[in-house]
């Protein structure tokens, strides 16, 4: 066993000992030993126990640990500490700037147990509320996590958007193709992006490579009619050069996905595609133009053949924003600041405020006394700013048994309720499904929040039987949230059509914790389009009068 492996193991042991509040002297002794072993000019594994004990700065106790590690390839003490520590907490120890003391606060005070949750908390500005954390530390942690994500070669759509659009503009300005389009996963608005692909109507000539080299991209590779390179952030880019007469089919081909292309090709039956546009090619196949977001294979062709392709929702269709937080719980801006931003900047008609409920102690959840005070503030605001309206909501935790964490009397005081799971996420499918369905069957539940609890590229959601959950929402007239945070985008777009077919409304909710968070509704709209959502099936595309009636009807049923 190499010295570096032994040192790394001792370092982890010292970190876990400190995390679990063991004797500071022993912690320091193990940490010092890790440093010492790493600097030794000879392999310590070749030494006897007695020889290790004689090494300056180690001693009998440390020598015993090293001997045990070399002989058994493990440490009983380390295994015991690891069994008491969530794997995600151990993973956090690799993040620069996070020592055991800070990790302990993150774990015990904020209730965060993995890197995905930590990244989400950074986006919500939750870390700056904790002891020993400031804005600078939070940003450094966020950047480190983003760097680690990038090293895996996969990105959230929101992470690559500004780069992709800037690259498109630069190509138009400096390479000057006749036409250029972003294609691939980006054009299909996929939630995860592996590469940025473009189609350029231009010959790949000797003038292009020097320009790309001057842009400081890495690993530039010239192929036949294609140039590949990597951005500074690690994003793979592919430029595909075509002539104008082939551009329609090439645009379809490079947009994909492959299943969509294969089905379309079989429908074309060898038709002449020369000088045809995208729309003309779909017409040759006997179907209407299919929007790029829908091109994932099978579902879109069934809709096209039955002339049932939806008029996809647009961001401008949204009339209000539901599921948002303020300084009453873990938000950054006050209730008034959030509402005025919606009213004056976004020109929306209403805001749904849904601060965390009392079980969410880690997020400054509201007890009954604070709830009453918040509702008084909402009443005062609504009097001053009519016709704009704040709806009184709450993000009520779905407890482990599926119940909500307030009495019926308190629940009846809200205009609407978003019910979400935030704790005990380690469930099998049966348990998770039953837990959600019990909450859905609660007459006070209006919207089911982020149904699987997933954090893209960071944390898998708990497994659920989507059909059973959606069917329960249909039976109980519960709306399902499309959580618009780019890390969530949950309900997954693959289930939107099933929900729509069952008559379930979907709601594009930003889960905003500060004013800038409302911008996430745009990402929610993109993923809703991918799922085939039209404004008629979207709750917050309703105007103020329509949604007020819906909430009132729900409240009347609660009283039956």
Each PLM stretch: what is its role?
Residues 180, 351-353, 448, 480:
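Hydrophobic residues within beta-strands of alpha/beta enzymes
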Residues 1-22:
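Charged, compositionally biased N-terminal leader segments and the immediate start
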Residues 14, 26-196, 200-227, 236, ...:
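Accessory alpha-helical DNA-binding modules that contact the DNA backbone or grooves
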Residues 180-182, 320-324, 395:
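Two-metal-ion RNase H-like nuclease active-site motif
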Residues 393-396, 523:
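Active-site catalytic microenvironments in core metabolic enzymes, especially phosphate/sugar-handling
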Residues 189-326, 335-346, 358-388, 400-560:
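Charged catalytic cores and adjacent phosphate/nucleic-acid-binding surfaces used
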Residues 113, 178, 348-349, 446:
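Short acidic/polar active-site loop segments enriched in Thr and Asp
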């Amino acid at each position: 066993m190499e010295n570096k492996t032994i040192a790394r193991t001792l370092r982890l042991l010292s970190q876990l000992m400190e995390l679990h509040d063991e004797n500071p002297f022993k912690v320091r002794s193990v940490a010092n030993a890790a440093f010492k072993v790493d600097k030794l000019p000879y392999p310590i594994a070749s030494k006897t126990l007695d020889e290790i004990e004689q090494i300056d700065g180690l001693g009998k106790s440390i020598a015993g640990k090293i001997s045990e590690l070399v002989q058994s390839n493990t440490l009983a003490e380390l295994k015991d500490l690891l069994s008491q520590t969530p794997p995600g907490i151990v993973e956090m120890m690799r993040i620069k700037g996070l020592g055991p003391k800070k990790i302990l606060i993150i774990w015990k005070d904020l209730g965060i147990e993995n890197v995905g949750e930590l990244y989400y908390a950074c986006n919500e500005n939750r870390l700056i509320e904790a002891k020993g954390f400031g804005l600078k530390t939070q940003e450094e942690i966020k950047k480190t996590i983003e760097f680690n994500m990038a090293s895996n070669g996969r990105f959230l759509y929101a992470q690559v958007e500004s780069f992709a659009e800037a690259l498109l503009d630069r190509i138009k300005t400096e390479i000057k193709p006749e036409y250029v389009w972003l294609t691939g996963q980006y054009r299909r608005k996929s939630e995860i992006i592996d590469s940025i692909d473009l189609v350029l109507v231009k010959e790949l000539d000797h003038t292009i490579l020097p320009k790309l080299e001057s842009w400081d991209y890495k690993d530039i590779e010239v192929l036949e009619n294609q140039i590949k390179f990597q951005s500074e952030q690690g994003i793979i880019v592919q430029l595909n050069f075509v002539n104008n007469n082939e551009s329609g089919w090439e645009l379809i081909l490079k947009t994909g996905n492959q299943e969509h292309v294969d089905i379309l090709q079989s429908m074309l039956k060898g038709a002449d595609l020369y000088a045809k546009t995208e729309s003309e090619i779909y017409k040759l196949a006997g179907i209407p133009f299919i929007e790029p977001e829908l091109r994932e294979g099978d579902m879109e062709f069934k809709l096209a053949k039955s002339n049932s392709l939806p008029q996809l929702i647009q961001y401008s269709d949204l009339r209000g924003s539901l599921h948002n937080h303020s300084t009453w719980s873990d938000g950054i801006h006050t209730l008034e600041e959030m509402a005025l931003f919606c009213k004056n900047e976004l020109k929306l008609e209403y805001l749904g405020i849904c601060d965390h409920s009392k079980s969410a102690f880690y997020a400054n959840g509201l007890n009954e006394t604070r709830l009453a005070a918040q509702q008084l503030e909402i009443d005062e605001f609504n009097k001053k700013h009519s016709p704009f309206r704040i709806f009184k909501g709450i993000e009520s935790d779905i407890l482990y048994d599926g119940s909500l964490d307030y009495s019926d009397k308190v629940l009846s005081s809200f205009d609407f309720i978003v019910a979400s799971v935030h704790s005990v996420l380690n469930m099998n499918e049966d348990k998770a499904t039953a837990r959600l369905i019990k909450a859905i069957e609660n007459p006070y539940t209006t919207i089911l929040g982020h149904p699987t609890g997933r954090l893209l590229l960071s944390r898998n959601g708990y497994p659920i039987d989507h059909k059973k959950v959606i069917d329960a929402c249909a039976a109980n007239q519960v709306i399902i949230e499309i959580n618009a945070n780019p890390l969530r985008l949950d309900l997954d777009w693959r289930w939107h059509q099933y929900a729509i077919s069952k008559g379930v409304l979907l709601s594009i909710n930003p889960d905003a914790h500060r004013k800038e968070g409302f911008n996430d509704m745009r990402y929610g709209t993109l993923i809703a389009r991918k799922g085939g959502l039209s404004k008629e099936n979207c709750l917050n595309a309703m105007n103020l009068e329509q949604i007020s009636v819906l909430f009132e009807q729900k409240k009347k049923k609660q009283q039956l």
